[in-house]
Every structure is written in structure tokens, then in C-alpha cells.
A protein has these predicted regions:
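DNA major-groove recognition helix of helix-turn-helix/homeodomain DNA-binding modules
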Residues: 45-60
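Short, solvent-exposed alpha-helical "recognition" segments
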Residues: 39-45, 71-72
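Recognition helix of helix-turn-helix/homeodomain-like DNA-binding domains
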Residues: 26-41
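Short alpha-helical "recognition helix" segments of helix-turn-helix
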Residues: 21-22
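Short, charged recognition helix plus adjacent turn
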Residues: 9, 15, 34, 60-76
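A short, Lys/Arg-rich alpha-helix, primarily the initiator
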Residues: 1-17
Length: 76
């Protein structure tokens, strides 16, 4: 299965754990694990809350090379 979201990678980049995110979101660690492995996807409202908690733009949770994406947009 192709990765749809980058939650696992962004958690790593922010030095946060899936257990931390589960606690902040009020869901089980198993639920966050499913999001991190892309075996299930959170709904849009949940994605927005995750982005807020991790202090990232929502696009960073989906675009693989977000920083490169931003640079390419600045050149346009």
C-alpha cells in the first residue's frame, strides 16, 4: 500500500511519539499506529488537529518533500 500520509515521519521530525499523539488526541495508541502505517486514515478534522498539535502546515502531513515543494512554489 502506498503511503497516503506522513504522520509517522513528521512525528519523528518533531521528536514526538505515537503514544504522545494518542494522549493529545484522546485516541488509543493502536489508532495512531494505524495512521502511522497508513493502514487507516484519519478524517480531515483529525488531520487538522494533528497538524495543529505538531505545529506544521497541514500539507506537510501529505507532501513527501514539503520543503522542496515550498521552494518550488517560491520560484513560480
Amino acid at each position: 500500500m502506498e503511503d497516503i500520509n506522513r504522520i509517522k515521519m513528521v512525528l519523528f521530525e518533531k521528536n514526538k511519539t505515537a503514544r504522545w499523539l494518542a494522549g493529545e488526541m484522546g485516541v488509543t495508541p493502536s489508532t495512531v499506529s494505524k495512521w502511522c502505517t497508513n493502514s487507516s486514515q484519519p478524517d480531515l478534522a483529525t488531520i487538522l488537529k494533528i497538524a495543529d498539535l505538531l505545529e506544521v502546515d497541514i500539507r506537510e502531513l501529505f507532501v513527501r518533500e514539503y520543503k522542496q515543494y515550498l521552494l518550488s512554489q517560491e520560484k513560480k
